[in-house]
A protein has these predicted regions:
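N-terminal secretory signal peptides that target proteins for export/translocation
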Residues: 1-18
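Bacterial N-terminal signal peptides
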Residues: 21-32
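Amphipathic, positively biased hydrophobic alpha-helical segments used for protein targeting
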Residues: 32-33, 158
């Protein structure tokens, strides 16, 4: 069997170019780019520290020494309602972009989601907090400067509070 030959002497698939080869090449390129973009999105991470704190009003002020990074904030309103603060739990956790991470608490539970990194020095996070009965008591998206602390508050009976403080690097 002989191949048909074009005027230039090429086989027909070479004579007019190969449209299906271009389609295959484009598919390969698009797939590679999509994979690269997926990897780039997955690489957006940050390391966060979570402090679970109990707060109450008492006769003598007392702040757990482990809370020294947030001590100044705890002495200002609205936290100055209480004067006794005790660390309940401490957790370091990496967060990946758009992935909700569970934050185990002594009282209830929480989740943290890294929304995005802003200006290379700030992180935008969504935090949800549930009480011990599973009722959501906080759901907030906020931007925090690296090294600064956010504090979420859940008021409890008897003028007590349940606080979740966090910072990210």
């Amino acid at each position: 069997m002989s191949e048909r030959v074009s005027e230039r002497g090429d086989a027909p698939w070479r004579a007019k170019g190969c449209p299906w080869a271009a389609v295959v090449m484009m598919t390969v390129i698009v797939s590679a780019l999509a994979g690269t973009l997926k990897e780039a999105r997955a690489d957006v991470t940050t390391e966060c520290e979570f402090l679970e704190i109990s707060a109450k009003a008492g006769d003598k002020p007392a702040i757990d020494p482990a809370l020294s990074p947030v001590e100044k904030k705890l002495k200002k309103p609205p936290f100055s309602t209480w004067n006794q603060f005790k660390l309940l739990s401490h957790l370091q956790k990496p967060l990946a972009k758009k992935k909700a991470e569970p934050i185990p608490l002594k009282i209830g539970s929480a989740t943290a989601t890294l929304v995005e990194i802003v200006d290379k020095s700030k992180v935008r996070l969504t935090i949800t907090m549930d009480d011990h009965k599973g009722k959501q008591v906080a759901n907030n998206t906020a931007t925090v400067e690296a090294g600064d602390y956010l504090i979420y508050v859940h008021g409890l009976p008897n003028n007590e509070g349940h606080l979740l403080s966090l910072t990210c690097k």
